[in-house]
Swiss-Prot record:
GO-annotated biological processes: translation
Alphabetized Pfam families for the sequence: Ribosomal_S18 (PF01084)
InterPro entries, per the entry: Ribosomal_bS18, Ribosomal_bS18_CS, Ribosomal_bS18_sf
Keyword terms, alphabetized: Ribonucleoprotein, Ribosomal protein, RNA-binding, rRNA-binding
Family: Belongs to the bacterial ribosomal protein bS18 family.
Entry annotated with the keyword rRNA-binding: yes
Function: Binds as a heterodimer with protein bS6 to the central domain of the 16S rRNA, where it helps stabilize the platform of the 30S subunit.
Originating species: Trichodesmium erythraeum (strain IMS101)
Protein name: Small ribosomal subunit protein bS18
Quaternary context: Part of the 30S ribosomal subunit. Forms a tight heterodimer with protein bS6.
Entry annotated with the keyword Disulfide bond: no
Gene3D superfamilies: Ribosomal protein S18
Cellular component aspect of the GO annotation: cytosolic small ribosomal subunit
Molecular function per GO: small ribosomal subunit rRNA binding; structural constituent of ribosome
Length: 72
């Protein structure tokens, strides 16, 4: 029987590190209001999502990313 479900492919390769200093990468996974996108939307693996969340929170702590984006 054929497999009807497409295998999900993570947008970030599993071996690639997620670094808190890579602000351009982190901004892709934050909403316009500044919230971290959930895993079902990002398509990351659970380990990558945990690493991404840690990196975003660390980047916010050292003021590389804002906690909340102001609405215009």
């Amino acid at each position: 029987m054929a497999n009807y479900y497409r295998k999900r492919v993570s947008p970030i390769k599993p071996g690639d590190p997620i670094d808190y200093k890579d602000v351009e990468l982190l901004k892709k996974y934050i909403t316009e209001r500044g919230k971290i996108m959930p895993r079902r939307i990002t398509g990351l693996t659970s380990k990558q999502q945990r690493d991404l969340t840690k990196s975003i929170k660390r980047a916010r702590l050292v003021a590389l990313l804002p906690y909340v984006n102001k609405e215009s």
